[in-house]
Amino acid sequence: MQERYSPTAVEAAAQQDWQARDAYRVTEHARNADGTEKPKFYACSMLPYPSGKLHMGHVRNYTINDMMARQLRMRGYNVLMPMGWDAFGMPAENAAIKSKVPPAKWTYDNIAYMKKQMQAMGLAIDWSREMCACDPEYYKWNQWLFLKMLEKGIAYRKTQVVNWDPVDQTVLANEQVIDGRGWRSGALVEKREIPGYYLRITDYADELLDQVRSGLPGWPERVRAMQENWIGKSEGVRFAFPHTIAGADGQLIQDGRLYVFTTRADTIMGVTFCAVAPEHPLATHAAATNPELASFIEQCKLGGTTEAEIATREKAGMRTGLTVTHPLTGAPVDVWVGNYVLMSYGDGAVMGVPAHDERDFAFAKKYQLPIRQVVAHEGKAYSTDAWQEWYGDKQGGRTVNSGKYDGLPYAEAVDAIAADLAAQGLGEKQTTWRLRDWGISRQRYWGTPIPIIHCADCGPVPVPEQDLPVVLPDDLIPDGSGNPLAKNEAFLSCSCPRCGKPARRETDTMDTFVDSSWYFMRYTSPGNDQAMVDARNDYWMPMDQYIGGIEHAVLHLLYARFWTRVMRDLGLLKFDEPFTKLLCQGMVLNHIYSRKNAQGGIEYFWPEEVENLYDAKGAITGARLKSDGSDVNYGGVGTMSKSKNNGVDPQALIDTLGADTARLFVMFASPPEQTLEWSDSGVEGANRFLRRLWSHCHAHRDAVARGLAAGADWAQAPAPVKDLRREVYGLLKQADYDYQRIQYNTVVSACMKMLNAIDDAKLPEGAHADAARAETLGVLLRVLYPVVPHVTWLLWRELGYTHSLGDLLDAPWPHVDEAALVADEIELMLQVNGKLRGAIRVAAKASKADIEQIAAAQEEVARFLEGRPPKRVIVVPGKLVNVVG
């Protein structure tokens, strides 16, 4: 055994051994030595995009997964921890444009490097199950399931107003628009009408909502709330404003009815205007003879189409000059075009009730429209001067200024008004959803080709199943001028499967969230080219633990739940929910330093380039450059980012201090679900701990060898030995509990306390001491192993534990010796007249009389009572004894 800890040598030796025996390959229905079947556990991290290098967020995510997998394997589980690559997407195209290489080469080069990094981390991954989204053998099943959804009517083609990213030149789903900008490019999103394919996720809205409300107890409440809000179930009334507006063909537009949906039918008597979306047929009709309105409508199309984007945009509108008829009063109602109305939501029109809707109130004030109160609250005076929160409160109010509906509370008013609208054939109660069907068409090259052929005679024709996969050419180099598939004749040209005439392939590719909606199930069925999943999927799924960032709460996680249900309904699965438990790990943060450059932009500096300035309390107040002493701004801590020069390269850390140091720090610095603030001193501390562990094992290797060879009668052990065993097993009990709670930072803390206890123990020489060192160090190595597998694995082997307990990967998890936790003696605080004067040790089973006698005989008692006899002795069991004199 080497005297000094060398992480490079240690980690190379461990990884070489694991690789040589394929230590992490798993099979279904694995059995114990006695023939009983092991329980399965499927733990999976969200697959990474192969951007080129791992970042510290990856290290944290995968170490959490790895700790879980290793510890459960020691506890007797058959554990699956797979890995794959979310390899399609726009970054590969953008990189290809810059470097003038095909996206395929860029992607596979990155995968090769990142895979080496993962292996250097020592992750317990079963690489025999590796998948890659850009592999035709994988995306063939995207295409196959799409065709099945097309057959069932779940997939369909339509033209709709969409979010268009002018930089990435593609359509974005609503979820991919953040504050009006594309989620990748950051460009302002535009509205365009484009044909594309959609998936009826709305058909599953009820089920998705019901399950997220009550059927996912293992998910964070925050994620469940985000999904519930996104699905957005609304119960209300859909009704029509009749009109006589005819189009150029002389026919009534939309059959003479302007439909709206409202959850506040009780306020219908307060309608003073209607607003329609810029794309609404009435808006188009009015704009045909109104150039100013036409210009306004074009301006409206420059924004995104999501509710989140609409909510933050300044509300603007323009009168169309058209009127519709109030269905209950017969009064004319002006029609406006509003930039806040979504054509894709409901009927693309809303009723305006300024008195009881804050948005309508602001709109009415801006354009000086009437405001008519129709709900009153007792003791509160309504004023149109400024909005007050109670104006929109439907609970506790009663209708006023509403004719025959006056005096009704909310629910009764809704029922009465809905009944009257239904009697006229103008409305009915209805449920609507915020959730929209999922548009999957993307005008990009690097994605799954949509398996459709366009024939001049037959129209869009599905590619026959036997012709799948439609293989994406992997040698094209995008130039930034649109989809290169549209210019690639070899890909485009084909024959119509129905009539045999020349035809053209669909050039749109699928949204990359299709790839990530089921990859975790492909891990369970590797190598099967005849089926999307097979019986092995029934063994592993649903997944026991999923690990990933909360930024995927609405996008990936919702789509995966939908995709699972589609596969279930096609008879491919026997379960509803893919993920039993979900852990969203926190971000990794680091300090941010910047200043304005000469061009007016912001220049960022690496933390190692600056020297911090502190106030009297030690808080950072600013910083200066080490190179020239000039001031820079300190921006606090933020998520590690290449653009802000505050990232830490995991590979550099692994190369210098080792993967175990990196793993130990990211697990110790913070609970897994909370943010982690990077600390160079914390990293150094983690490395010091490992060096100290190694030194201790080296110093006591002979004692451990003797202790392993001989047994021990612990009942006859001296007190220091019993104390050490009691402390270590107490810490093991806590670590067991923390492993179950996935509180890995306190597991590491327990390990550090164990080493302190073992290192500091003053054990008398002899067989008991040797046996205690061997036993307690064996406990420590096993508890610490899931965190730092390389160094613990080698120490386990070097110290001889393998001979009696087997290889550390499958060594039995240590059991708490409850007998060791029972103390022979206990320590009681000694007080004299209520003041602490020392401590006494008594037998754990000592009687009250024995304790009183021992306490009264202490020298401290005689000294502080100045020779007086005690008047009484108060014993607080297990804590203290107070001698009163």
UniProtKB/Swiss-Prot annotation:
GO BP of this protein: leucyl-tRNA aminoacylation
Class of the enzyme per the UniProt entry, highest EC level: ligase
Subcellular location: Cytoplasm
Sequence motif: 'HIGH' region, positions: 48-58
Residue span of motif 'KMSKS' region: 639-643
EC number: 6.1.1.4
Keyword GTP-binding belongs to the record: no
Keywords: Aminoacyl-tRNA synthetase, ATP-binding, Cytoplasm, Ligase, Nucleotide-binding, Protein biosynthesis
Superkingdom of the organism of origin: Bacteria
One Gene Ontology MF term: aminoacyl-tRNA deacylase activity
Catalytic activity: tRNA(Leu) + L-leucine + ATP = L-leucyl-tRNA(Leu) + AMP + diphosphate
Any one Gene Ontology cellular component term annotated for this protein: cytosol
InterPro entries, per database record: aa-tRNA-synth_I_CS (IPR001412), aa-tRNA-synth_Ia (IPR002300), Leu-tRNA-ligase (IPR002302), Leu_tRNA-synth_edit (IPR025709), M/V/L/I-tRNA-synth_anticd-bd (IPR013155), Methionyl/Leucyl_tRNA_Synth (IPR015413), Rossmann-like_a/b/a_fold (IPR014729), tRNAsynth_Ia_anticodon-bd (IPR009080)
Binding-site list for ATP: 642
HAMAP family given in the database record: Leu_tRNA_synth_B (MF_00049_B)
Recorded family membership: Belongs to the class-I aminoacyl-tRNA synthetase family.
Stated name of the protein: Leucine--tRNA ligase
Protein source organism: Bordetella petrii (strain ATCC BAA-461 / DSM 12804 / CCUG 43448)
